[in-house]
Amino acid sequence: MAFPAPAFSLANLLNGSYGVDTPEEVERVRSEQRDEAAAACRNYRPLPAVDVSESVPEDAHSLRTPDGAPSEEVSVEFVTYGAEDYLEKSDDELLVAFETMVKPMRIGQLWCPAFNKCSFISSIAMARALLLAPRTSHRTMKCFEDLVAAIYTKSDFYYDDECEADDVQIDISSRDVPGYSFEPWSRTSGFEPPPICEACDMIMYQCPCFDFNALKKSCAERTFADDYVIEGLDGVVNNATLSSNLGPFLVPVKCPYEKCPTPVGEIPPDLNRATDRVDINLVQSICDSTLPTHSNYDDSFHQVFVESADYSIDLDHVRLRQSDLIAKIPDSGHMIPVLNTGSGHKRVGTTKEVLTAIKKRNADVPELGDSVNLSRLSKAVAERFFISYINGNSLASSNFVNVVSNFHDYMEKWKSSGLSYDDLPDLHAENLQFYDHMIKSDVKPVVSDTLNIDRPVPATITYHKKGITSQFSPLFTALFERFQRCLRERIILPVGKISSLEMAGFDVKNKHCFEIDLSKFDKSQGEFPFKIQEHILNGLGCPAPITKWWCDFHRFSYIRDRRAGVGMPISFQRRTGDAFTYFGNTIVTMAEFAWCYDTDQFEKLLFSGDDSLGFSVLPPVGDPSKFTTLFNMEAKVMEPAVPYICSKFLLSDEFGNTFSVPDPLREVQRLGTKKIPCSDNDEFLFAHFMSFVDRLKFLDRMTQSCIDQLSLFFELKYRKSGEEAALMLGAFKKYTANFQSYKELYYSDRRQCELINSFSCVELRIERSSSTKQREKKDGIERRRNDKRRTPTGSYGGGEEAETKVSQAESTGTRSQKSQREGAFKSQAVPLPTILSSRWFGTDRDVPPCEHGGIVRV
C-alpha cells in the first residue's frame, strides 16, 4: 500500500518528514528505472516481425529478448545506486567504490590517477546515461565499472577485442548528450608503471626487500676490507717471552693482505715538460720574498747563548741531578747549505734546553674543560665513534692473528741495533711507569714570519726501551690494521700499506673543505679522552686484560732525561714515543670530531694523528666549541679552509683523480737543511737526494690546471703570492733531475781543511816490491794494511810490480821533523817523470827501478 507524500508544512519540515523518501517511494522509483532499462535493451536493435495475434509474456524482473536480439543481463548495481546515492555516501565509502571501479595504482601513499570526489560522481552519472542511451555503434561498450574508469581516465569507452584494424572509428562526439562531448583519447602523460619485485610480486617501493629505510640500517657502507683479499696463512715461530707477557690468545701465524688490482679506465698521458732555466740565485730570491725573516736567520751560536745567558723557569715537581751527566760526543761535521732558508742547526740536549722543551711540551697543562660525568659520557662518545666510522659486519668478520708475525718483523728490523730475543725483559717484572725522555735534535722548520722575534723550541720524545716497545708494538700494529679494514669507505687514514692520500674518482674541486687545528694536543689529553680510547680499544677487540694493563700504567708516569739530569712526573697526557702514540691520537681525534659534527654530511673524511680534513657539498654544520668545553682542546677552525693535511696539498687532475703534493714552502726550507753529515763518498747527501725525489714524484702529474690549483691554495693558506709557488715547482724539477744538480745546493769546508793539512800528514811512497816484510815495514814507518787508496800498478824492469803506498807521518818526535825535512828536500830533487811510468809519456823503454826509489813528499 502506497502512502501519500507528506504535505509541506513547518511541522513536517522541522521533524524531518518532508523531503525524505519513504520506502514505498524508493521502490516505485527503482521499478520505473528497471522498466526503462528493459525498454532500452529491447530498443537496442529492431525487433523481428512477429505475429500480432501471438502474445509475448513479459516479466518485469526477468526480461527475455526475442530470437536474434543480443542477450544481455541488466546490471542491477548501477541502477540501484545512482549519482544522487553516491552523494550521500561518506568519503571512506567513496574511496572503496573508487578503488573498486577505477582500480588506481598505489605508489606509496599516492594513487594514480588521484581521487577527486566531483569527477568520480560525474563519471558515474555519465556512465549511467551512456548505458541508457540508444547505441549507435556495433562495438561492444564496456561494463559499468570499466566505463566509469574509462570516463574518469578519459580513455576509450569500447572494448578493443572485437575491433578490426581496418575499421574506421566512429566519431562518438556527435552523440546527442546535452552538455558533454566524448572522444577517444589515449593516455600520453608519460607515466611508467613502477617495477615489480619478482620475489613477492609487489611494487618495489612497497616490497620489504627494497625498503630503503631498512636497507640503510641493515646494509653497511663499503669498507677498505672489500678491496683486500687474504692471500694465505703462513706459520711463524712462536716466542715464549711474548706469549707469557701478552697472553695465550696469540696465534703463531701470519695473515698477509693484498690489495685487489684497481681497474684503470684511462691512462693519463706523459706530462713531462721542459721547465725554464733555474739557478741558485732565483731560488734564493724566492726564499727572500716568501720568507722575509728567514733569510737573515743564523743560529750557529744559539747553543752558546742558551748555556751562557741567565736562565729562569717555573716548573713544579722537577728533579735535577747534575752529578753524572753524559757528555756530548762530537760529530764529524755537517754539510753547509748554499741556500739560507731559516733552517736551524741540531740542538744539543743540555739541561737548559731540555727544561725549555719540557716547559712547552709537557708542563703547564691547560684546564679548559667543564665538569662532566666521565663514565657515562665516555661510553656515549665511544658508541658514537663506532656508529660514525665502523662497519659492524666487517669488524665481526675480521681476524686478529698477525701479532706474532708483526713481532718477528719488528725484531728483524732492529736486529742490526743489537736487539735479540734473549734481551726481551719480563714485562711483569718491569716498572712500566718509567719513561725515558729526550729532545729532537732536528727542529721543525717554521713557516710563519716570526724568526726575528722568536726561536723555535725543539719537540720532546717520551719513550720506552726497545725491549718493552717490541712487545707492545706488534699488538697495536695488528689492531690498527684490523681497525683500518673495518672503516667505512669514505674514512681515510693515510698511513700503512692499505691507505694513502691518492683518491681515484674523487674531485676536491667544488667542495667545502673543513679543517680543525688542535693545539697542544698531546699534553691537553686528560682522563676523559683516556677513558674514551679505553672503550674504543675494547670495542675493536683488544683483550680486556691488556687494555686495562696498558691504561693503568699510563695514568701516572715519570719521565727522566739521563743526559740532562732532569725528571718530572706526568699523568694522562700522551706519550710521544710509545707504541700507541699515533693510533691513540687518531682515534681520539676521530671520536671528538664525531661528537661535535655529524659525519654523514661529509663525502670524505681524512684523519692522521691530530690532523683532520673533511669534504662536503654543503657547508658543514656543528659545534666546534665542544672541543674546548668538553674535551679540553684548543681548537681553531681554519678559515679559509683548503685541502691541506699532513703538510700536503690535495689536487685533482683532469681525469677526476686526487693526488697529494708536498707543501712547496716546506720543501724549499728543506733544501737549506743543516743536518746532513759529511762523508767522503757523499752517501748521506745521496740519501737525502733520493728522499727528495721520492717526495716530489708528483711533478710528472702537474698540468697547468694543477699548477693553478696549487697557486690558489697556496695564496689562501699563507697569504703569499701563488706565482712563487709555481716558480718553486720549476726549481724542484731541476734539482730532481740528477744528483749533480742537487750537489750544487751543499758544500763542505772539511774537505778544504783536509786538502791543506794533507801537505804535512800524508806521504806518497813509491818503491820496488821486494818482500812482504819489507812492504809492511820500512824505514821505521808502518804502512796501513787496510788502506784502499792505491793507484793502479804498472810494470817496471824485470817484470816486477811497483805499488803506491800512503801512510800517516809520525806526529811527534824528532824523527817526524827529520822525515819532513828529508821529504821536502827529495821532493825538490826528484822530478815528476821519475814518479810516473815512462809509458805515460810515450816511451816504451824500461827504466831501472833504482832511479825511482825514495820517498816523495807531497
Curated annotation (Swiss-Prot):
Entry-linked Pfam families? RdRP_2 (PF00978)
Domain RdRp catalytic, chain residue ranges per copy: 511-624
Matches recorded under InterPro entries: Bromoviridae_RdRp, DNA/RNA_pol_sf, RNA-dep_RNA_pol_alsuvir, RNA-dir_pol_PSvirus
Please write the reaction equations for the catalytic activity of this protein: RNA(n) + a ribonucleoside 5'-triphosphate = RNA(n+1) + diphosphate
Q: Which GO terms describe its biological process?
A: DNA-templated transcription; positive stranded viral RNA replication
What SUPFAM superfamilies does the database record attribute to this sequence?
Answer: DNA/RNA polymerases
Q: Which PROSITE patterns match?
A: RDRP_SSRNA_POS
Assigned keywords, A-Z: Nucleotide-binding, Nucleotidyltransferase, RNA-directed RNA polymerase, Transferase, Viral RNA replication
Residue ranges under compositional bias (Basic and acidic residues)?
772-785
The GO terms describing molecular function are:
nucleotide binding; RNA binding; RNA-directed RNA polymerase activity
**In the Enzyme Commission scheme, what number(s) does this protein have?**
2.7.7.48
Family membership noted in the UniProt record: Belongs to the ssRNA positive-strand viruses RNA-directed RNA polymerase family.
Q: What is the stated purpose of this protein?
A: RNA-dependent RNA polymerase which replicates the viral genome composed of 3 RNA segments, RNA1, RNA2 and RNA3.
Q: Spell out the subunit comment.
A: Interacts with replication protein 1a.
- Annotated protein name in UniProt: RNA-directed RNA polymerase 2a
